[in-house]
């Protein structure tokens, strides 16, 4: 079957490349940004569920650690974990329309980033990861495109919630360079400060060649180990001295280079190579907030490191007949090196003091080939047909996560058909895809874009994803936009690997009184979601107003199973990762941009969540605000001076309704976070045409939240040893922080 799939991929690529006729050489200067036709991908950027963040917006509102801070100000976007557990609560990642970080696809220049997939998934689906939004320095970003709902489905695996496409600044045929620096100073000394500096250089390498090079170094200190002292949930017995940790620190080192060859008009080849190293500065976190003297001794140390290498070759082409192609191959290697961790019960995700190795490695190799062609067609109506194919392979060598013992202490006994020792550290999966879209201008005011995508996964089989987007002008000022698409996400390499086994003595087991195992399941189905949206938009003389309703009918969400699939000889129940039949996410997004005057602009967006429900259990899918309002007032006081005020208002945040055994949450597990707001001020001064300064303050009124623990109680509140649940209080909101940045360029 795989040979047939590979042969089909080769034929499709040959067919795509054979469509176009080379353009005759001319003396016309080459523009790197020429748009030949309006493709379906470009039309999708006009959908109601699409937002763009510009380089100037990033410059005037600089971020500290990574760009997730500014991405979260877009409609439908928040920061959260992958479940309602609250585990790793300060490692919050991008969540789009309540679908969770695992359903948010991160791209850099249109190419997927998968480094976070090298981090083990815990029993509740959480990963101890900072996500994939910090691999590009903020100052090197040209723009960020955030796609939500049906517009994102064209990107295939992992885009059921949405897509974040980070577009980097490009090289040119002229010499240019930049140097940037950023630092902040939290008003509370127990909160970690950030310093960052980076450079870029672009220029010609002869008549047809150009290059771009950038480098970056930044450091964020860890929060104090006792930052949450006095705010922790109730703890007793052996847990009495434990504390939930604050935000960990991080040291980033990045270097990236691109060489471009414009070998003919509208024809270019780009070769990219990049290397990044991210090391944490440990703040004391454990998966179950059950720190001890050994974990506390690691405070401030580097306990995990990610080494990322990426290489890509891209060919973009255009021809006299209007045909354009985009073809690339990317290789990404991530080495996740970390202190060995436990895999059983309360020790899961906790440093293993008895480990014989200081660090163990998880290596993830990701290869992707992508080819697409855009064909302008003048038949009945103006239309542009897009045809494409992709092939992706992920291979993992994990020397850490498949090592849970099945015999001896802290185990549940042997499992039939599973080796008690020396289980294979290897796992892999492949996806072959075909896709087609057609952007049709039926009238001057009506655009219809149907699409169809086919994915074949080497483990879970085939998936078909149809899509339809419609844009209908209603007079000069109003536009009605609608979309529906079937989105798709394949299970992770952990969820499908039978050698990945976790153990619990009982509390983690949904319907078992005693101990149980959780095992990877190679018989899983892919997650799917029918994403729908309807939006009405008004534009006139700089005014913009819009409202969008969205609903995602979620099928086969993958979670730890609720029903034991068997029992071993000593009575230990066996659970597997399983598909939840149905879930639903529904909400509203609104926007209002008002040109108050020639120099003052007021921009606003709001997201209101109507539903977020697992229909099997009745529980919430994630802990996110009921509503989020983002408002920015920008004033161009002088030609060289601009000022901004930002206001964000978060609605109440409700915790999970049920514990891991399906019993209603009680006592402190039901704590909600009340609505709160964050205000920021900033000013940008263009000192000269080559130098600008930005200074400001985040969280002006010093509204802080403290992490109290995980959502659910560990142990028995009526017993001697327990950690009470914290409800929704699972993360830290940092207080007032002053910052300054310097941007220079030539």
Curated annotation (Swiss-Prot):
<feature type="signal peptide">
    <location>
        <begin position="1"/>
        <end position="22"/>
    </location>
</feature>
<feature type="region of interest" description="Disordered">
    <location>
        <begin position="76"/>
        <end position="96"/>
    </location>
</feature>
<dbReference type="GO" id="GO:0030313">
    <property type="term" value="C:cell envelope"/>
</dbReference>
<keyword id="KW-0798">TonB box</keyword>
<dbReference type="GO" id="GO:0044718">
    <property type="term" value="P:siderophore transmembrane transport"/>
</dbReference>
<dbReference type="GO" id="GO:0019904">
    <property type="term" value="F:protein domain specific binding"/>
</dbReference>
<dbReference type="GO" id="GO:1903981">
    <property type="term" value="F:enterobactin binding"/>
</dbReference>
<dbReference type="GO" id="GO:0033214">
    <property type="term" value="P:siderophore-dependent iron import into cell"/>
</dbReference>
<dbReference type="InterPro" id="IPR039426">
    <property type="entry name" value="TonB-dep_rcpt-like"/>
</dbReference>
<keyword id="KW-0406">Ion transport</keyword>
<dbReference type="GO" id="GO:0042931">
    <property type="term" value="F:enterobactin transmembrane transporter activity"/>
</dbReference>
<keyword id="KW-1134">Transmembrane beta strand</keyword>
<dbReference type="InterPro" id="IPR037066">
    <property type="entry name" value="Plug_dom_sf"/>
</dbReference>
<dbReference type="GO" id="GO:1902495">
    <property type="term" value="C:transmembrane transporter complex"/>
</dbReference>
<keyword id="KW-0732">Signal</keyword>
<feature type="compositionally biased region" description="Polar residues">
    <location>
        <begin position="79"/>
        <end position="93"/>
    </location>
</feature>
<dbReference type="GO" id="GO:0015685">
    <property type="term" value="P:ferric-enterobactin import into cell"/>
</dbReference>
<feature type="domain" description="TBDR beta-barrel">
    <location>
        <begin position="174"/>
        <end position="746"/>
    </location>
</feature>
<dbReference type="GO" id="GO:0038023">
    <property type="term" value="F:signaling receptor activity"/>
</dbReference>
<dbReference type="GO" id="GO:0015620">
    <property type="term" value="F:ferric-enterobactin transmembrane transporter activity"/>
</dbReference>
<protein>
    <recommendedName>
        <fullName>Ferrienterobactin receptor</fullName>
    </recommendedName>
</protein>
<dbReference type="GO" id="GO:0015344">
    <property type="term" value="F:siderophore uptake transmembrane transporter activity"/>
</dbReference>
<dbReference type="InterPro" id="IPR010105">
    <property type="entry name" value="TonB_sidphr_rcpt"/>
</dbReference>
<dbReference type="InterPro" id="IPR010917">
    <property type="entry name" value="TonB_rcpt_CS"/>
</dbReference>
<dbReference type="InterPro" id="IPR012910">
    <property type="entry name" value="Plug_dom"/>
</dbReference>
<dbReference type="InterPro" id="IPR000531">
    <property type="entry name" value="TonB-dep_rcpt_b-brl"/>
</dbReference>
<dbReference type="GO" id="GO:0042914">
    <property type="term" value="P:colicin transport"/>
</dbReference>
<dbReference type="Pfam" id="PF00593">
    <property type="entry name" value="TonB_dep_Rec_b-barrel"/>
</dbReference>
<feature type="domain" description="TBDR plug">
    <location>
        <begin position="42"/>
        <end position="169"/>
    </location>
</feature>
<keyword id="KW-0408">Iron</keyword>
<keyword id="KW-0812">Transmembrane</keyword>
<keyword id="KW-0472">Membrane</keyword>
<dbReference type="GO" id="GO:0009279">
    <property type="term" value="C:cell outer membrane"/>
</dbReference>
<dbReference type="GO" id="GO:0042930">
    <property type="term" value="P:enterobactin transport"/>
</dbReference>
<keyword id="KW-0410">Iron transport</keyword>
<dbReference type="GO" id="GO:0022834">
    <property type="term" value="F:ligand-gated channel activity"/>
</dbReference>
<dbReference type="InterPro" id="IPR010916">
    <property type="entry name" value="TonB_box_CS"/>
</dbReference>
<comment type="similarity">
    <text>Belongs to the TonB-dependent receptor family.</text>
</comment>
<feature type="short sequence motif" description="TonB box">
    <location>
        <begin position="34"/>
        <end position="41"/>
    </location>
</feature>
<dbReference type="InterPro" id="IPR036942">
    <property type="entry name" value="TonB_rcpt_b-brl_sf"/>
</dbReference>
<keyword id="KW-0675">Receptor</keyword>
<dbReference type="GO" id="GO:0006879">
    <property type="term" value="P:intracellular iron ion homeostasis"/>
</dbReference>
